[in-house]
Regions:
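Flexible hinge/capping segments at coil-to-helix
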Residues: 146-183, 266-269
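Short helix-boundary/capping micro-motifs
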Residues: 1-19
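A short LG(V/I)-centered, amphipathic sequence patch enriched
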Residues: 31-48
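Beta-alpha-beta core module
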Residues: 144-151, 155, 217-263
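Alpha-helical linker/hinge and terminal dimerization helices associated
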Residues: 33-34, 55-77
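Central regulatory/effector-binding core of bacterial HTH transcription factors
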Residues: 81-142, 206-213
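Conserved amphipathic alpha-helical core elements
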Residues: 12, 30-31
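Secondary-structure junction motif
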Residues: 138, 182-203, 264-272
Length: 275
């Protein structure tokens, strides 16, 4: 599964904390067992065969079921232990999670915390698919009825530019003023971008998007050198950014999501309670 997800034996080995020869040996063992070729050489890399693509969804289902068996058995133990696989957006991981996770690992030293930095939208899908037990992310404007959400942090969004940008010198701006200048927004599928674009759509407007980028830290740098205006969390403001004088309040909700229909490990339950 890891080799198919990454397209690389070496990267898969790093993620699994084993050697490349060990990964190759396991692949050959699977090929011998099933009597089919799972990967073929392609230049300097490898590519999965049709058989591998056919096998992948069944393997993922089996891994999810195996994980639920582990979670069920964890409730029979008095000690909270085992591996807890969680996801977090880069922004939340860098700005909000350090202290809570530090407290968690001190309270439950027998738990191996497996933290994956992913985009909020990707984390949402991985929780839905059972690939993550729990994720910390920007909550979607419209949630999925199959998942449970808890808002933890309110994250105000502000319009920003470089201090020397023409918009920074103006007062009482409106959205019409902004569309005359290039904007730097997150990719259209991101929740932050959806929140921003919906405000323009309400007014029948469309911003002039010259560049879409992720993560937000990259956008902050591009804005600071004068390439355009953007919408960023208010916590990003510093001497390199100027909040634009626009009478419009926008917020995004940051929190956690999990799948209530799946059996939660005791470690996941404890982290949910801690948060």
């Amino acid at each position: 599964v890891k080799v198919m997800e990454t397209g690389s034996i070496s990267i898969a080995a790093e993620l699994l904390f084993i050697t490349q020869p060990a990964v190759t040996k396991r692949i050959h063992s699977l090929e011998d067992y099933f009597g089919v070729k799972l990967f073929e050489s392609a230049g300097r890399g490898i590519q999965p065969t049709h058989a591998a693509h056919s096998l992948l969804p069944k393997v993922k289902t089996w891994l999810n079921e195996l994980g639920e068996i582990h979670h069920t058995l964890s409730h029979e133990q008095t000690q909270v232990q085992g591996r807890l696989k969680i996801g977090t957006s880069h922004h939340i991981g860098l700005h909000h999670l350090a202290e809570p996770l530090k407290k968690f690992v001190q309270l439950f030293p027998q738990v191996t915390l497996d933290v994956h930095f992913v985009d909020s939208e990707q984390a949402h899908e991985q929780v839905l698919a059972g690939e993550l037990e729990l994720a910390f992310l920007t909550l979607p404007p419209a949630g999925d009825d199959r998942l449970s959400y808890v808002t933890i942090w309110n994250d105000p969004l502000v319009f920003v530019s470089a201090p020397f940008h023409p918009l920074a010198k103006q007062t009482q701006l409106n959205l019409e003023d902004l569309i005359a200048y290039p904007s730097l927004l997150p990719a259209a599928q991101t929740y932050t971008s959806q929140i921003t674009l919906s405000e323009f759509e309400k007014n029948g407007l469309k911003p002039k998007i010259t560049m879409s980028n992720n993560p937000l830290e990259s956008i902050r740098m591009l804005v600071s050198i004068g390439l355009g205006w953007s919408v960023l969390p208010k916590t990003f403001l510093n001497e390199d950014l100027k909040q634009l004088d626009l009478n419009l309040k926008m917020n995004r909700q940051l929190g956690m999501v999990w799948h209530p229909a799946r059996i939660q490990s005791r470690a996941a339950e404890e982290l949910i309670q801690l948060m």
